[in-house]
Amino acid sequence: MLADAQQKILNSSQWLTADQLYTFAVSTGQNLCTTPNEWLSKGMIFSISNEETELFPLYALNPNAGYVLAKELVNIIEVFRERKDGWGMAYWFGSANGFLGGRRPQDLLQTDPEAVLAAAKDEVMGITHG
């Protein structure tokens, strides 16, 4: 069951190794001073481990802004830092979200990053009773 869930996430987006992500970003005109592994250590991106290979989500880069990191991603990662590991974040980004009208956060990260951040905060708050 876990393997099926992981495969679903791997199929939901394009995942790249650190070298592939770096090469991709540079090929689109980025002048990178840091590498994906440095982004990871600074909490600017997340990764998953699949068959001993560290993978990064391509949706973390904004194609409408020259493939720079999505502007709200660091804030979303900060919201989840103490609650979700890389796979936990990948599941969240790749799953339909009721707060987002059934859409997946990864599909809205570029077009409505503020809504995705609000959904992340809602996820952390959980159910509140009033």
Regions found by a protein language model. Name each.
Residues 1-130:
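Non-transmembrane "mature" sequence context
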